[in-house]
């Protein structure tokens, strides 16, 4: 959801997450959120279309971060490096507040409709990333493959970071995951010999 400065929008987001955790998403109204945040319902609606938008209001901004990072990546980077560069920028934009992100993830997990919207967002970001790779000259099939695999690895790492213990940041987790992925892709078969075993007789 991004960083948590002290503006009205951020106060509303904090209040909403607290209430969603305490009462459940379905049982929380905009009036409840406004009261917890210490603002009027009209103020909430000035910042968010509805209570669902409180959870997804940063999506366009985060998508723009992803797009702009891919677009501004150094021209000599490989397509895979561009994917990593863009996803690193997204990791920074998500911010360091793991507790707030955990609360948001728990709310999404509790509601099928919210999960569907989140999946739609992920697909949109993946397609956006693929289009930026195509614009840089990558073949479409390659661009779509790299964007999809990069996004899937990011989601898996992000989920592990949210649910895991320890003080490491998301970027540290991404670096570790990519190193492990590289070893898995380029290392020998089953750790020895460098060749795949033949069929059993």
Locations of regions flagged by a protein language model:
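Basic, helix-initiating cap at the start of DNA-binding domains
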Residues: 1-23, 27-39, 56, 65
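Residue-level detection of the helix-turn-helix DNA-binding "recognition helix"
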Residues: 35, 49-50
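Short hydrophobic/aromatic patch on the recognition helix
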Residues: 40-48
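Alpha-helical DNA-contacting segments of helix-turn-helix folds
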Residues: 52-62
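Hydrophobic alpha-helical connector segments
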Residues: 64-106, 110
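Hydrophobic alpha-helical segments that form the core
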Residues: 108, 140-160, 173-184
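Amphipathic alpha-helical packing segments from all-alpha helical-bundle domains
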Residues: 112-136, 144-148
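C-terminal peripheral helix-coil segments that are non-catalytic and often amphipathic
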Residues: 166-201
